[in-house]
Swiss-Prot record:
Family per record: Belongs to the bradykinin-related peptide family.
Gene Ontology cellular-component terms listed: extracellular region
N-terminal signal peptide: none
GO annotation (BP), single: defense response
Function: Induces relaxation of mouse trachea that has been precontracted with methacholine. May induce relaxation of arterial smooth muscle. May target bradykinin receptors (BDKRB).
Organism: Ascaphus truei (Coastal tailed frog)
Coiled-coil stretches noted in the UniProt entry, renumbered to this chain: none
Origin superkingdom: Eukaryota
Tissue expression notes: Expressed by the skin glands.
Name of protein: Bradykinin-like peptide RD-11
Length: 11
């Protein structure tokens, strides 16, 4: 996933 997609999951 692109950076900042989720503050908890960035995979």
């Amino acid at each position: 996933r692109p950076p900042g997609f989720s503050p908890f999951r960035v995979d």
